């Protein structure tokens, strides 16, 4: 019966199959902190976020760039100790430039804590970056391979990251990744550093990289995707990257990050679940986003999907009436879907009927009944009239006062 109530064009003939692997890397505590408008939180807040990432089944977390200074290294060490002492399933990685002085702090923390850290070694790869820096391709190859060999020689797994991959020449990508495989990289990361890529471009570059790795004897080498939101395409590009062969994609809480931010890892989790690509309990999603908001001093927009205040609220008469009818049928499944493309209960939320100037009397009656107040004709009329005269939704306290 339920299958007949919604025709889902998203999964009709030709829908992409589930990727062979679906892994997530949370960049909130590294790239997220590069946002110009957030605060680097104290270590207790970082620990809380790490635990919530773990609850959501996120595979890896980038816990910082320890080469940035003593505090950064101390925080990375503290988070590694938290992973060990709390026996968290989430694994750690850290960013570093392709220079020894950035790699050494990662080695030190690993040796002190006994916690393996994947070293995410990054270097620019696009011609525009090469021109600005005065680099040639030989420099990129030498800098990359020496850094990878040094990290691997000191017991680190390496994710080799080419910044600005989505604007790099094919021959440069081919050479850098081929040499990275030979030097011992375990994974590579295709980075859309400036948020330049479209979904088609994402699929093309990820598919190209897969071919390069296979030709270099790196069929076992996994591909990461790291995207930004400068064109508003961060989230959809993550899905395109999975379709094209990436096995791990990056994101941040609430999409925070450099400039316009990174792909929203919270919304990525939602979409992966709705696509059927993951199956896990995501009811901690609200707690995760609230914790990130409080730690980083970044408010959650009211209209933010799923976790924003407005996501599952309505005061519009026609919409509310349909939801109320579903509730009166005793069908929570129906109420969760009749005016929502995202089932609230799957993510720890519920539908909420509000009262405002566009409401009908059914909104008022439902609010009264759900708050244990008998909806007399006079009371309904009093609240309904007040709502029509208001220029916004009435808060619960105002409605309670009208109940007298």
Give the positions of each predicted feature.
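A mid-to-C-terminal "edge-of-domain" accessory segment
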Residues: 1-30, 278-404
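N-terminal capping/small domains of soluble enzymes
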Residues: 1-98, 355, 359, 370, ...
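Alpha/beta enzyme core
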Residues: 19, 24, 35-60, 76-87, ...
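Short, ordered loop/turn segments at secondary-structure junctions
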Residues: 29, 65-66, 95-98, 122-126, ...
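Short glycine-rich loop/turn motifs that provide flexible caps or phosphate-binding loops at active sites
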Residues: 31, 63, 123, 194, ...
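Conserved active-site and cofactor/substrate-binding residues in soluble primary-metabolism enzymes
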Residues: 41-44, 48, 70-74, 101, ...
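Catalytic alpha/beta core domains of metabolic enzymes, predominantly
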Residues: 197-330
């Amino acid at each position: 019966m339920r299958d007949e109530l919604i025709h889902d064009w998203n999964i009709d003939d030709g829908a992409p199959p589930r990727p062979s692997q679906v892994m997530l890397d949370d960049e909130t505590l590294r790239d997220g902190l590069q946002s110009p408008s957030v605060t680097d939180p104290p270590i207790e807040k970082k620990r809380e976020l790490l635990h919530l990432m773990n609850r959501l089944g996120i595979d890896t977390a980038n816990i910082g760039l320890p080469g940035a200074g003593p505090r950064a290294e101390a925080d990375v060490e503290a988070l590694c100790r938290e992973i060990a002492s709390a026996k968290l399933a989430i694994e750690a990685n850290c960013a570093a430039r392709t220079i020894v002085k950035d790699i050494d702090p990662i080695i030190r923390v690993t040796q002190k804590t006994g916690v393996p850290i994947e070293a995410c070694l990054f270097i620019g790869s696009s011609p525009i970056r090469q021109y600005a820096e005065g680099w040639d391709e030989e420099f990129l190859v030498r800098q990359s391979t020496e850094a990878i060999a040094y990290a691997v020689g000191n017991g680190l797994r390496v994710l080799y990251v080419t910044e600005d991959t989505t604007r790099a020449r094919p021959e440069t990508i081919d050479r850098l990744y081929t040499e990275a495989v030979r030097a011992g990289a375990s994974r590579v990361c295709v980075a859309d550093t400036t948020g330049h890529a479209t979904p088609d471009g994402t699929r093309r570059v990820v598919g190209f990289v897969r071919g390069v790795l296979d030709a270099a004897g790196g069929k076992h080498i996994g591909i990461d995707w790291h995207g930004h939101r400068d064109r508003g395409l961060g989230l959809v590009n993550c899905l395109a990257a999975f379709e094209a062969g990436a096995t791990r994609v990056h994101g941040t809480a609430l999409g925070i990050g450099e400039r316009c931010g990174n792909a929203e890892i919270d919304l990525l989790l939602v979409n992966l679940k709705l696509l059927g690509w993951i199956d896990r309990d995501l009811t901690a999603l609200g707690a995760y986003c609230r914790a990130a908001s409080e730690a980083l001093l970044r408010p959650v927009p009211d209209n933010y999907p799923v976790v924003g205040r407005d996501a599952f609220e309505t005061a519009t008469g026609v919409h509310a009436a349909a939801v109320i009818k579903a509730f009166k049928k005793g069908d929570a499944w129906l109420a969760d879907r009749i005016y929502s493309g995202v089932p609230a209960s799957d993510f720890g939320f519920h539908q909420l009927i509000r009262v405002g100037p566009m409401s009908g009397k059914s909104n008022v009656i439902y609010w009264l009944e759900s708050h244990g107040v008998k909806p007399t004709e006079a009371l309904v009329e009093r609240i309904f009239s007040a709502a029509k005269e208001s220029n916004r939704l009435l808060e619960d306290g105002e409605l309670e006062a009208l109940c007298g």
